[in-house]
Amino acid sequence: MKYIEEFRDGELAQRIAAHVRAEARPGQRYNFMEFCGGHTHAISRYGVTELLPENVRMIHGPGCPVCVLPIGRIDLALHLALERDAIVCTYGDTMRVPASGGMSLIRAKAHGADIRMVYSAADALKIAQRHPQREVVFLAIGFETTTPPTALIIREAKARQVDNFSVLCCHVLTPSAITHILESPEVRDYGTVPIDGFVGPAHVSIVIGTRPYEHFSREYGKPVVIAGFEPLDVMQAILMLVRQVNSGRAEVENEFVRAVTRDGNESAQAMVSEVFELRPSFEWRGLGEVPYSALRIRAQFARFDAEQRFDLRYRPVPDNKACECGAILRGVKKPTDCKLFATVCTPENPMGSCMVSSEGACAAHYSYGRFKDIPLVAA
């Protein structure tokens, strides 16, 4: 298939890896963070790290939307389903994220709550139209990639006067999170690692373009290379980052030229701006409160805002103390550093959100066997 098979060529991957090994200076460390969960998945699936020299390290960043969703947000959705008799609709991975008291949306569904998995925001609106006597709430999560469809469906609900439909908005923003990682004293208190450059997200960049990343390269001296999802995309991006570091450059480069432009999808951006505005602050799992890092629904669409309609009050909830998901999201620890990984915590029984989504670092490591260094204990 065009644009797929040719980006999975093993021989070409070996040649790119040879260039990385040749150009990475032996006495220097290269710490690169891939922000996108799709990149984390590709790196584990195709064994990219095994092709890199020891002094080139890939750090898994907070780019999985399910992983960064805090417990308190899931609790709000559970409250609507269990106590307000609402039909709650959301994407599949969100159903399994652990919430307070060991509950999750899928467990609440087993207890009788009307919680439904949907493939799109449009599915949730159709459910609201089929059940006009019930309140239907769409739990909307994701980065800039999934925000335009939510904006479109809110606008459509207003036009069609579907008054029993609302959205619990948990959409978050990539540039704000990267800024927070680079400069926040709170994150420094949590602990973090030195970052020499970023592999920029693919789908997000299709929407927002490369322009927003120019701030990081200019203000923080950090190179950014936007990369596609295939293994050769990631390998080439790593090589481009090594070359930037070696030459003392900090620029935004676009490896994913077949899909990403400097200005992105301006029609999608305009639609998002019409329906949403910035929140002053939003809690991220692993990062804490991040200023201006999420969206809320504008006043002219307030009747479709579940937080206002149901007078919801967000309450932060601490993570499971034994789960290292927060530290893994910051790159401080690897999945194999967590004592729950591949023992109590598996994709079938996730203790933390990093094991829920296939884009999560723990799930990717588990699914593709990247944990062979865990010592086996004899029975």
Curated annotation (Swiss-Prot):
Record's keyword annotation contains 4Fe-4S: yes
Cofactor: [4Fe-4S] cluster
Statement: the UniProt record of this protein carries the keyword Ribosomal protein: no
Any one GO molecular function term: 4 iron, 4 sulfur cluster binding
Gene Ontology biological process terms in this record: protein maturation
Keywords, comma-separated and alphabetical: 4Fe-4S, Iron, Iron-sulfur, Metal-binding, Plasmid
Pathway listed: Protein modification; [NiFe] hydrogenase maturation
Superkingdom in the source lineage: Bacteria
Annotated binding of Fe cation, by residue: 36, 64, 67
Family: Belongs to the HypD family.
PANTHER family in alphabetical order: HYDROGENASE MATURATION FACTOR HYPD, HYDROGENASE PROTEIN ASSEMBLY PROTEIN HYPD
Role played: Involved in the maturation of [NiFe] hydrogenases. Involved in the biosynthesis of the Fe(CN)(2)CO cofactor.
Name assigned to this protein: Hydrogenase maturation factor HypD
Organism, scientific name: Cupriavidus necator (strain ATCC 17699 / DSM 428 / KCTC 22496 / NCIMB 10442 / H16 / Stanier 337)
